[in-house]
Amino acid sequence: MKKITIRDILKMKGKKKIVMVTAYDYPFAKLVDEAGVDIILVGDSAGMVVHGLPSTIPVTMDMMLLHVSSVARAKPRALIVGDMPFLSYEVSIEEAVRNAGLMLKSGAEAVKIEGGSEMVDVIKALVRAGIPVMGHIGLTPQRYLLLGGYRRRGVKEYEAEKIIEDAKELEKAGVFSIVIEFTAADIAEEITKEVSVPTICIGSGPYCDGQVLVLHDLLGIYEEIPPFAKKYADLRRIVIDSVKKYAEEVRNGVFPERKHYFFSKRREAEK
């Protein structure tokens, strides 16, 4: 199968729904790629679902580079997008370009940046440097403190207008796609119609050019998931039951079975 590129994603606009999912390591990158996703997002959500952090704010570049390189070693057909963590691109344009470059050197094929019109200069600089950029508007988790929490966006008119304007500004700046998070569905629909690049929704309705979910949410690894997510499996229960079964067999002397071990020649001679 041919490797998916930025050009392929752009061609899917309005024609074929884009499927994006997060993955943070080699084995899950292999599995989701085998499932046929179009984009693997190495999200800073790893901080919460993998490392147990309370938010994405403490996530560092070193953490993200480790996850990106692990995913890249899976050599997926899907496009690999690395999430730029908090304060890796806001301090200066030079630092943003340097950090985004490290993402690509670690195996990412594009980077994702949160923010609207205030990020235009950074995005332009990255694109000039040859770094593909995915935008992210609506609910931007790295700014949840400023936004007053993880709340719905675009319900009020002034918010809706700002999000629509942000999308247009990001398009002009050169992004190849835009994630729209936890935003009113009609606003996401309007944006999708007005911009020429693909939009990818998460909690923003069915009208975008694609959808994205956090892998741990759709697999049901945790009991609680965001209101816009859907569990397609109950992996939490599968893991618990499997380990319980293993523990039971160890304690009852059932595991290991004869096929799981061998003897030295000394034991064979004793026979």
Curated annotation (Swiss-Prot):
Positions bound to 3-methyl-2-oxobutanoate: 44-45, 83, 112
Reaction equations catalysed: 3-methyl-2-oxobutanoate + (6R)-5,10-methylene-5,6,7,8-tetrahydrofolate + H2O = 2-dehydropantoate + (6S)-5,6,7,8-tetrahydrofolate
UniProt cross-references to CDD domains, sorted A to Z: KPHMT-like (cd06557)
EC number: 2.1.2.11
Any single Pfam family the record assigns to this protein: Pantoate_transf
Cofactor(s) the record lists: Mg(2+)
Cofactor note: Binds 1 Mg(2+) ion per subunit.
Keywords associated with the record: Coenzyme A biosynthesis, Cytoplasm, Magnesium, Metal-binding, Transferase
Subcellular location, record wording: Cytoplasm
Keyword Oxidoreductase: no
Lipid metabolism keyword on record: no
One GO CC annotation: cytoplasm
Job description of the protein: Catalyzes the reversible reaction in which hydroxymethyl group from 5,10-methylenetetrahydrofolate is transferred onto alpha-ketoisovalerate to form ketopantoate.
Assembly notes: Homodecamer; pentamer of dimers.
Protein name in UniProt: 3-methyl-2-oxobutanoate hydroxymethyltransferase
Species annotation: Staphylothermus marinus (strain ATCC 43588 / DSM 3639 / JCM 9404 / F1)
Gene: panB
